Each structure stands twice: as structure tokens, then as C-alpha cells.
Design a protein with these regions (language model features):
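Short, low-complexity N-terminal intrinsically disordered segments enriched in polar/charged residues
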Residues: 2-42, 54, 94, 98, ...
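Short solvent-exposed beta->alpha transition segments
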Residues: 49-89, 188-198
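Surface-exposed, charged secondary-structure patches
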Residues: 71-115
């Protein structure tokens, strides 16, 4: 009779409940970023909206397709799609989870920086670019867990959040429309130069 409590004799290793590890390491990330940036660069060269789907999804796919539509109607380089920066990696925050979808946040670039959100929908799916944005100059990053540890995603009902994420979208819209007359203005630092610029 097998001894299922002994990992040496047991036919499969014992599970360690509650221990979550990072879903990606830096060598995997480097390969994924290289593959994504190559697919996007080829699609950018021909404004091929369909080939993007291989490694781009969600809001990033919508943004890229809209950029291609603008670029197709203009010869001005101002409307050229933003290049996806695969390196150097400035910040790498993989998820720590055993479920899907899995998300990883990466900040890349040198003189100009981008934040990229990568998502894997299932265990047999490739990571795809889910969201991206250029960052403002002189931005500083908060301290994050080490890449070997990863980070857990917060649930919407987390008690440590000052508001639920669903309300945040409504509040941001109200704030943009009404400015400092919005009841949401109390949550904004009035001395923040970025807020004044927007």
C-alpha cells in the first residue's frame, strides 16, 4: 500500500496549499516580449489589423486597430502607431496565482517608457499584449514585490481599497466632466501638476 504522506514513496508530490509563486521568470518574459514586439512590428509595417490577434488582445488590440485606421488615412508620421518597447525591462511584476487569466505588468524602455500588461487566458494559450501606455517623463515607480515572488491580484471587494473599482470609472468620468466641482475632487491632490495639466 503506497504511503501518500511520504513524498519519496508517494506516486505524486504532495501539494503545498496556499503557496503561490510567480507565474513567469525573467527569461520567459524576455522571450514573450521579443515575440510580441516582432509580431506587432510586422503588423505595423503593413497596417495588418488581422495578424495582430496572434499576440495582441483586449484594449490593446482595439487601440492598435484604431491607430492603423488613422495611419492608413494619413502620410504624416505623427499618426504612425507607437512602437512597442520590448527592452530594457525597468520593472517586472508577474502575477502570483494558480488560476487564469494570468496578468503580468512590465515597464520597458530607456529614454521613453511604456507600461505593458500581458495576459495569458489559459494554460495552453500564449501570453498576449492586453494593454499598453506611454508613461510621463521622470516617473518614479513604487516598490513592488520581487519578480520571483510575484503579486496577488486584489479582489474588487478588498477591504483595503478606498473604493470599489467599478465606482472608480464613474468617478473619473464625473471628475473629467465637472473638474473640481465634482464630488470626486476630494480624492485628488489639488497640488498635483499632472491633474492641473489634464
Amino acid at each position: 500500500v503506497p504511503d501518500y504522506q511520504n513524498p519519496i514513496i508517494s506516486p505524486k508530490p504532495l501539494e503545498q496549499p496556499g503557496v503561490l509563486t510567480a507565474t513567469l521568470d525573467s527569461s520567459q518574459l524576455e522571450r514573450i516580449l521579443k515575440e510580441i514586439s516582432e509580431v506587432v512590428a510586422v503588423a505595423d509595417a503593413t497596417l495588418d489589423r488581422e495578424s495582430l490577434e496572434v499576440r495582441v488582445t483586449g484594449p490593446a488590440l482595439e487601440i492598435r486597430r484604431a491607430a492603423y485606421a488613422l495611419a492608413a488615412k494619413s502620410t504624416d508620421s505623427l499618426f504612425a502607431p507607437t512602437k512597442i518597447l520590448a527592452s530594457p525591462v525597468q520593472l517586472f511584476l508577474p502575477g502570483a496565482t494558480d488560476t487564469w487569466p494570468r496578468n503580468t505588468i512590465v515597464v520597458t524602455g530607456e529614454n521613453s517608457l511604456q507600461v505593458l500588461v500581458l495576459r495569458q487566458d489559459g494554460p495552453r494559450d500564449d501570453y498576449k499584449l492586453y494593454q499598453y501606455s506611454d508613461l510621463l517623463p521622470n516617473i518614479s515607480f513604487p516598490e513592488v514585490p520581487a519578480e520571483v515572488v510575484g503579486a496577488n491580484a486584489l479582489k474588487e471587494d478588498n477591504k483595503f481599497l478606498s473604493m470599489d473599482p467599478a465606482s472608480l470609472v464613474e468617478g473619473l468620468g464625473n471628475l473629467l466632466n465637472r473638474g473640481f466641482e465634482s464630488p470626486w475632487a476630494l480624492l485628488i491632490d489639488p497640488d498635483n501638476q499632472y491633474v492641473a495639466d489634464v
